[in-house]
A protein has these predicted regions:
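Short beta-strands within extracellular/lumenal beta-sheet-rich domains
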Residues: 82-91, 477-490, 546
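Short, surface-exposed beta-strand/strand-loop-strand elements in extracellular ectodomains
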Residues: 109-122, 514-522
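C-terminal outer-membrane/trafficking sorting elements
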Residues: 4, 9, 507-509, 513, ...
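Beta-sheet-rich sandwich/jelly-roll-like modules and their strand-loop junctions
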Residues: 439-523, 555, 560, 566-624
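Serine endopeptidase catalytic core focused on the charge-relay Asp
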Residues: 144-355, 359-360
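Catalytic nucleophile loop of clan PA
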Residues: 227-237, 365-388
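Protease-domain processing segments flanking chymotrypsin-fold serine proteases, especially trypsin-like
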Residues: 11-86, 135-142, 147-230, 439-472, ...
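C-terminal subregion of chymotrypsin/trypsin-like serine protease catalytic domains
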Residues: 271-277, 284-287, 377-447
Length: 718
């Protein structure tokens, strides 16, 4: 008998599986349907609110139904197969692309467990337990996909009082902030193409501080950005700085959900994992006229979140280079960069005069709705402001306004309206403070991937000798491949805590299909099984996204090892495939497969002799002084190309003047292809490739001081 542990996924929880109700003890299910709403109307209404906001940049994604549901007023009680008392209550809101709930008076007793799940338990959150209780009694849950969810509450004995919580809000997602269907955003709204993924080379200077940035879901319906900040006591107190127009009251702070590490693992638009979230915070300081709020998280981020506490600088001197890391449209983490000094400026009549740093034009990327509260960093990765709003977009990335950290410091003497009281408990009054990663030893964690700049995540089909499709090289197939694996080398005493898989394809009709994660030691030519690290039902994965699987027990392999995905328990008719890269040259192939009982590397097996690696990101702890980012480099690249997936226009930004005669584009046959050139400045050009056949191209650019080449993917504009 196989026992599946940890099938529940989502925010900080205790894992496990919902208990089954005894067949002879099942009562009538209780279902409540919310009043009908139109997603199209709600989107229109959201746009109207945005226009009236005068450039502020929060994102409204959900409609709130205020309710009062509790075990004494709704739902049905049953007995489980092992004698526990089970309360179930189903909520439906027709047309919702996801649902999330807010609880009040949330005070679970020590043995109680709560789960939330979609129809058929395809997606499960929990178990939530007494460790999720907070001083405020407010508890927010991450959205679950679809328009129906069930709350299951489990207690060992049916006491006289069972109202250990009240559901007070049902939030109907009309935009689609989860990746549940083939489109990354079902309503077609995601971050614009000029946005730069935070793991692109252009962001290397701010590599450490990116782990401070989080997406904030405010009361289940609005999305903003924020950042963990350090204080002079250097005690890892989990303060998050954001905008006042995002979190302005204690109620909003209590009902916020903070999502960390929501990003692509490499420089490409692969959707991130959404499981690293924490519910609730306490408002410490806020000031509407300077548009800042400081909150303290109810739960400190655990080591597996790899939290970094950003430093800050309260000097009034303007830095020469600025970057903002944020979540535009609530999408994966992006970065916008300005290589010029900002200007001191005013923004809107309701704010203090000259209370803002104005980015006059972004050199790379932009901000959008959802970016509100996002930090503005100087070149030393110190926070100098938080985004309030502005006019910037991809078409015209100009005029964004960031509330000044130096004014928020102590412009007002009231401790509830300033930052100094909270961020300088040591009373040393420094002008600046560096950021810090406080975890160490066994708690120091990092992530590792072989995806690199210039890669594209894709799926390669297999063909048999008759040219008939026989499945995927990195997934289910009819060609004898039973396991696919990624090879890692991590010298030291690191412990493996989990792995994130970039799932590219899922077809799941059989609820019993599952994947098994195995760890193999590699010693010379000998590959031996170390352990079975996890088993996960196929129904628990999101397609077209990274899916983090945290192991129940840490694994310590030898220095070189394989992280393998066993496919043998995928039932007939079901399909799964993991994204991978395809390279016509190095670096060394790290993608391996087990075929007919023996291990082979992908390069020597595929007829096109592609190199490759799986879209897999390893979570390891006890990493010592090793770099936690696989591809960070000490010096920025001489040229920056964006986007890497091009519909027509490619931008090239360089640190030195561009020589137009050095600029040419080749196809994979080495043939130069035509393009249209527009010089925006001495160091910024755009080339238009319209009329060329979709495919992979190599772009070359240079001057007397540098030369650079970059691979892009040209696609049709839909």
């Amino acid at each position: 008998v196989f026992l599946f542990c940890g099938t529940a996924r989502g925010q900080l929880s205790s894992g496990g599986t919902p208990r089954k109700i005894a067949p002879l003890k099942r009562g009538t299910a209780d279902v409540v349907t919310m009043p009908a709403v139109s997603n199209e109307f709600l989107m229109w209404q959201s746009r109207q609110i945005q226009e009236e906001a005068g450039g502020l940049k929060p994102l409204r994604f959900a409609h709130t139904f205020e309710v009062q549901f509790s075990p004494s007023t709704h739902g049905s009680w049953n007995l489980s197969e092992d004698g526990w008392h089970i309360w179930q209550f189903t909520i439906r809101s027709e047309g919702a692309l996801s649902l999330n709930l807010i609880f009040e008076r949330f005070a679970l007793p020590s043995q109680a467990r709560m789960y939330l799940f979609t129809s058929g338990q395809q997606f499960v959150s929990g178990a939530f337990t007494a460790r999720n209780n907070s001083e405020s009694g407010i508890f927010s849950v991450s959205p679950l996909p679809g328009d129906e969810l069930t709350v299951q509450y489990e207690i060992p004995e049916h006491g006289t009082s069972v109202d250990d919580f009240v559901i007070t809000a049902v939030n109907h997602d009309f935009l689609g902030i989860l990746k549940y269907v083939d489109e990354r955003r079902p309503m077609g709204i995601m971050a614009e193409s000029c946005n730069q993924d935070v793991n692109c080379a252009v962001a290397d200077r701010w590599r450490a501080v990116q782990n401070s940035v989080c997406r904030i879901m405010v009361q289940g319906r609005d999305l903003c950005s924020g950042a963990l900040v350090n204080n002079t006591a250097k005690n890892a107190k989990p303060y998050v700085l954001t905008a006042n127009h995002c979190i302005s009251t204690s109620l909003k702070a209590n009902g916020s959900l903070f999502l960390f590490n929501y990003e692509s693992p490499y420089c490409g638009p692969l959707d991130g994992d959404v499981s690293h979230s924490l519910s609730g915070s306490k408002l410490k300081a806020t000031l509407d006229s300077l548009d800042f709020s400081l909150v303290e998280l109810s739960t400190p981020p655990p080591p597996s979140f790899r939290p970094y506490y950003a430093g800050w600088n309260r000097s009034s001197i303007q830095p020469d280079t600025m970057a903002s890391i944020h979540h535009p449209q609530g999408d994966i983490k992006k970065i916008a960069i300005d290589y010029q000094s900002p200007a001191i400026s005013s923004f809107q009549s309701g704010f203090l005069k000259n209370g803002f740093r104005k980015v006059q034009r972004w050199d790379a990327g932009t901000t959008e709705i959802g970016s509100s509260g996002g930090p503005l960093f100087n070149s030393d990765s110190q926070l100098t402001g938080t985004l309030s709003g502005g006019a910037a977009n991809c078409a015209n990335p100009v005029n964004d306004y960031f509330a000044r950290f130096d004014m928020a410091w102590n412009y007002r003497s009231d401790s509830t309206k300033q930052l100094k009281y909270w961020l300088d408990p040591a009373k040393t009054n420094p002008t600046s403070l560096d950021g810090k990663q406080f975890n160490e030893g066994e708690n120091l964690c990092g992530t590792y991937t072989h995806m690199r700049n210039g890669d594209h995540h894709e799926l390669l089909r297999m063909m048999d000798t008759n040219g008939v499709n026989s499945g995927y090289w990195s997934g289910t197939n009819n060609s004898g491949i039973t396991e696919v694996a990624e090879k890692f080398s991590l010298p030291g005493r690191e412990t493996l805590r989990g792995v994130s898989l970039g799932i590219g394809k899922i077809k799941n009709d059989n609820p019993n299909s599952y994947l098994t994660i195995k760890i193999y030691d590699v010693q010379g030519e000998v590959i031996s099984l170390r352990t079975v690290a996890d088993t996960v039902f196929l129904k628990n994965f999101f397609p077209d996204a990274m899916n983090l699987l945290e192991f129940a027990s840490a694994v310590q392999p030898v220095d070189t090892f394989l992280v393998a995905v066993n496919l043998e328990n995928i039932r007939t008719g079901d399909t799964v495939a993991i994204y991978h890269s395809l390279r016509t040259d190095g670096p060394e192939n790290s993608f391996f497969l087990k075929r007919n009982g023996s291990w082979q590397d992908f390069y020597s097996t595929n007829p096109s002799r592609y190199h490759g690696n799986l879209a897999m990101e390893l979570l390891a702890c006890n990493i010592g002084n090793q770099n936690t980012d696989t591809f960070s480099t000490p010096e920025p690249d001489p040229a920056f190309f964006y986007p890497t997936v091009v519909t027509s226009t490619l931008h090239i930004l360089t640190k030195d003047d561009i020589d137009e005669h050095s600029l040419f584009v080749c196809n994979l046959l080495g043939q130069q292809v035509p393009f249209y050139l527009n010089r925006i400045s001495r160091r910024h050009v755009e080339i238009n490739l319209r009329g060329n056949t979709p495919g992979i191209y190599i772009v070359n650019v240079g001057s007397g001081a540098f030369s650079a080449r970059h691979k892009i993917l040209l696609v049709r504009d839909r």
